[in-house]
């Protein structure tokens, strides 16, 4: 996320820019509300907390991640450098970013070959999936020197992703791809909603 913020243009799509880039930027801007339950151009802790709860994380973890997320991005996205105890995060000035593994080019376009490189380089046990140990090694390999906040951010992002999307301890290529196109979040939310519905039915006399 931190590397992605440094790399992606922090402006809304322009009518004059490349059509493909404009399409992708609009895609991410449209995906942000569904992930964080954003109602306006800004959201506070309560919104991402609900969003992570919808994905299946516990109450404590949802609250922790939401505060960490807002603390890291609030100052970067505010139009003016003002202190805000609720740490508001403004979506308008930037393209929504996802887990960073350098799969974008300098213009913010998704590069398929770079995505596949993740598994070609780091998937040792299974060619189309990553184990927790392989993810840890990947993060260590991709570290930027002295970027301690970035290390922590990347570790938390991948740890949560592995916890929520792993299948028998494996994070599949399809699951990781789902992060970039937004489909994984919808799948996790539907899965949790379905589980909740079944639980309620079982409790009925």
From Swiss-Prot:
The modification Phosphoserine is found at residue 183. InterPro entries: Caleosin-related. One of its GO terms (cellular component) is lipid droplet. It comes from the Eukaryota. Keywords: Lipid droplet, Phosphoprotein. It holds the Pfam family Caleosin. It is found in: Lipid droplet. A motif (Proline-knot) lies at residues 79-88. The keyword Phosphoprotein applies. Transmembrane regions are predicted by sequence analysis tools, but these regions probably constitute hydrophobic domains associated to phospholipids. Belongs to the caleosin family. This is Probable inactive peroxygenase-like protein. It comes from Arabidopsis thaliana (Mouse-ear cress). The lineage of its organism: Eukaryota, Viridiplantae, Streptophyta, Embryophyta, Tracheophyta.
């Amino acid at each position: 996320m931190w590397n992605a913020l440094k790399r992606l243009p922090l402006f809304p799509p322009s009518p004059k820019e490349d059509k493909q880039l404009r399409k992708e930027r609009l895609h991410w801007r449209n995906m942000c509300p569904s992930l964080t339950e954003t109602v306006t151009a800004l959201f506070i802790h309560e919104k991402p907390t609900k969003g992570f709860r919808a994905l299946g994380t516990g109450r404590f973890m949802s609250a922790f991640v939401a505060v960490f997320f807002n603390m890291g991005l609030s100052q970067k996205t505010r139009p003016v450098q003002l202190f805000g105890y609720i740490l508001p995060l403004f979506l308008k000035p930037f393209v929504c970013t996802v887990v960073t593994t350098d799969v974008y080019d300098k213009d913010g376009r998704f590069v398929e070959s770079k995505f596949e490189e993740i598994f070609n380089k780091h998937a040792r046990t299974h060619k189309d999936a990553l184990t927790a140990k392989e993810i840890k090694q990947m993060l260590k390999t991709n570290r930027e020197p002295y970027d301690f906040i970035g290390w922590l951010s990347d570790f938390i992002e991948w740890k949560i992703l592995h916890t929520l999307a792993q299948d028998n301890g494996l994070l599949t290529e399809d699951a990781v791809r789902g992060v970039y196109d937004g489909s994984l979040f919808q799948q996790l939310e539907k899965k949790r909603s379905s589980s909740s519905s079944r639980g309620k039915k079982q409790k009925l006399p």
